[in-house]
Amino acid sequence: ISKLPVDQIVQVQQAVSSGENGMGGFGPVQDGVILPDMPLQAVNEGSAADTPVLMGTNRDEAKLFNAVPNRPPLDDDQLREQVGQMLKSDAATTNRIIQLFADSRAAHQLPASNHDVVDIIQTMVGFRVPGNRFAECLSRHQPKTFLYLFSWESPARRGDLGACHALDMPFVFGTLDAPTQDRFAGKGLDAENLARNMMDAWIAFAGCADPSHPGIGNWEPFERHKRNTMIFGGECLLT
């Protein structure tokens, strides 16, 4: 590959990055030598049985990647086309999925425009569903599997970013006071309390493989048939 022209590499990169789920197409490649099994298959068979894991996703991961200036409007036909291509679903299934997510967001008092719907479906396809599948496979062998969903919303772009990709990082690492961070992560007592609860959870997990602490209470592990998930947002709640 080092002998290929840069333009040709970039052309291939652009083709792969415009993957079906809109989030890029790069991933592990099973070659039978360096990577004998696909990661999810290996975890499902117990390759990580000795490793406790604390993992999670943000509610609106895709909104950060889709936050382009002057984002083009998305009408109903374009929404159906994008979702159908993303999920490889027929028209009836596509319509049901779109309605399901639109209704769910509205029920939770979240914006439910066509852009919001395609964003949440991209988030599910690219982040949350793969994460949940990993947790399902790992929890078969490792009882200390802990899952979270981050729902704190960014004030940036008049709130259009929602709980986007990377927004959890300043809370986990305690950098809310970094220059200009308040524009992205917010500020105030609620933000500080959330950061404290998340940092204490990560510290507790690092110390004894259990993220429970007085600020959030008992954090029960994730199980395939009891999908315990800690919600980190305006309040911390195990669901």
Residue ranges of each PLM-predicted region?
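C-terminal, loop-rich substrate-recognition/catalytic regions characterized by aromatic stacking residues
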Residues: 48-104, 154, 170-173, 189, ...
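Short glycine/proline-rich turn/loop motifs
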Residues: 97-117, 175-186
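Proline-rich low-complexity regions
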Residues: 28, 52, 70-71, 88, ...
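Mobile gating loops/cap/lid regions near enzyme active sites that modulate substrate access
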Residues: 10, 14, 120, 128-239
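Short coil/turn segments at secondary-structure boundaries
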Residues: 13-15, 24-28, 95-101, 110-115, ...
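Short amphipathic alpha-helical surface patches that mediate protein-protein
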Residues: 2-6, 102, 153
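Substrate-access "cap/lid" subdomains that shape
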Residues: 1-84, 115-140
